[in-house]
């Protein structure tokens, strides 16, 4: 049976994960009148609203994911923490998954990611994988990994969690147990990202390079800005490396690749995620095709869309204010919406907590500097709080 919704009236696109990325994928699919089913463990998952079918269930449970996928003609992910074996079985039964389960097995584990980069000659910072924190401590006692270094949990990290820049022995001794890796610090000048889409027929589309500025304490993306500050040759090199990674993996769907740029201008692949990414949200307002629509197109055997930016843009995350946890209230939303060129996206999460991603805003302008100023003004006008009882 064809996997195109325009030739199969029974076509349903399955989205595994019902958070904000799932919600934006749902919107892209519904705009083309594609039926969507959503799987998520939370009863208040943002992506449940507007879905043709919503199912509650654990994303890491083999049977749950398998049975959900069997009711779909194509399956996409909004999160890596999904049972990859279920995806492999779905593919064996003729249901394409984006990404394939075999690719997910690599990318959902940072240690496997780094090993893959090294195996295929892709530039990445020097690293060592450890099965436990005790093994890392033993290696350090023998002289390896003097301070400072970067510690990463092999699994379970997101939005800055599971990554620590270790500067003191106290920090080193407080690291949690589990499979992990130690990584050398890059003499960092800039962090950038690239999204690449690839169809089952091998068609590819590469998005413009975006700059990422991080919050100094939350380790979350604070601003994403396009066009990049990188010289054109360096930006083209980042796009080529991202494309090489996609093709080396045999990935179909969407891959978001994060890079470090050192002070000598060298590019180092940091991490890759086989799904839409925070660094690509700007594409909703300022690109010919959004990252979400592009993944929907790839998963539905549709031609990929154009990736040219039609304006400068800056995206700022809307996160929970420190000291506030509970039912969410948005202070200053009207002020944000009154600003020219600023687009506000709220994800539908009912509860806020410090630094939780509750939404984002994107500012478009003629220049990157102006877009960033607008995004900063919008972010500063909005506070994500709880109301006093």
Name the predicted role of every residue range.
Residues 184, 281-284, 361-364:
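Short, well-ordered beta-strand elements within core beta-sheets of diverse protein domains
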Residues 1-115, 134:
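ATP-binding N-terminal substructure of ATP-dependent carboxylate-amine bond-forming enzymes
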Residues 237-257, 263, 273-325:
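Active-site "cap" helix and flanking loop/linker of ATP-utilizing ligase/carboxylase catalytic domains
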Residues 162-264:
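Internal nucleotide-binding/catalytic subdomain
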Residues 99-163, 169:
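A conserved helix-loop-beta module that forms one wall/lid of the active-site cleft
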Residues 9, 297-389:
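Peripheral (often C-terminal) accessory segments that flank ATP-dependent C-N-forming ligase machineries
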């Amino acid at each position: 049976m064809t996997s195109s919704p325009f030739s199969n009236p029974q076509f349903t696109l399955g989205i595994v994960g019902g958070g904000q990325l799932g919600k934006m994928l749902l919107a892209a699919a519904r705009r083309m009148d594609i039926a969507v089913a959503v799987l998520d463990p939370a009863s208040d998952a943002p992506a449940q609203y507007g879905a043709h079918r919503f199912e509650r269930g654990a994303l890491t449970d083999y049977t749950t994911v398998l049975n959900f996928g069997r009711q779909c003609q194509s399956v996409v992910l909004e999160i890596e923490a999904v049972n990859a074996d279920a995806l492999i079985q779905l593919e064996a039964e003729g249901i394409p998954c984006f990404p394939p389960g075999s690719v997910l097995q690599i990318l959902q584990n940072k240690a496997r990611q780094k090993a893959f980069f090294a195996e295929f000659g892709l530039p990445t910072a020097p690293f060592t994988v450890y099965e436990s924190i005790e093994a890392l401590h033993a290696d350090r006692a023998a002289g390896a990994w003097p301070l400072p270094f970067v510690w990463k949990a092999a699994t379970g990290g997101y939005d800055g969690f599971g990554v620590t820049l270790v500067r003191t022995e106290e920090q080193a001794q407080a690291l949690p147990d589990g499979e992990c890796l130690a990584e050398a610090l890059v003499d960092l000048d800039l962090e950038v990202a690239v999204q690449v889409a690839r169809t089952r027929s091998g068609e590819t589309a590469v998005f413009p390079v975006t700059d990422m500025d991080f919050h100094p304490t939350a380790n979350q993306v604070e601003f994403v800005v396009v066009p990049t500050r990188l010289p054109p040759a360096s930006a083209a090199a980042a796009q080529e490396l991202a494309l090489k990674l996609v093709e080396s993996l045999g990935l179909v769907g969407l891959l978001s690749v994060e890079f470090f740029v050192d002070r000598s201008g060298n590019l180092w692949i940091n991490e890759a995620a086989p799904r839409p990414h925070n660094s690509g949200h700007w594409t909703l307002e300022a690109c010919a095709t959004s990252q979400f629509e592009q993944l929907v197109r790839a998963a539905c055997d549709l031609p990929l869309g154009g990736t040219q930016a039609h304006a400068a843009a800056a995206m700022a995350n809307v996160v929970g204010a420190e000291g506030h946890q509970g039912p969410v209230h948005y202070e200053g939303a009207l002020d944000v919406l009154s600003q020219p060129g600023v687009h506000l996206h709220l994800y539908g999460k009912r509860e806020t907590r410090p630094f939780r991603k509750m939404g984002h805003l994107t500012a478009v302008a003629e220049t990157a500097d102006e877009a960033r100023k607008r995004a900063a003004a919008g972010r500063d006008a909005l506070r994500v709080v709880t109301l006093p009882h």
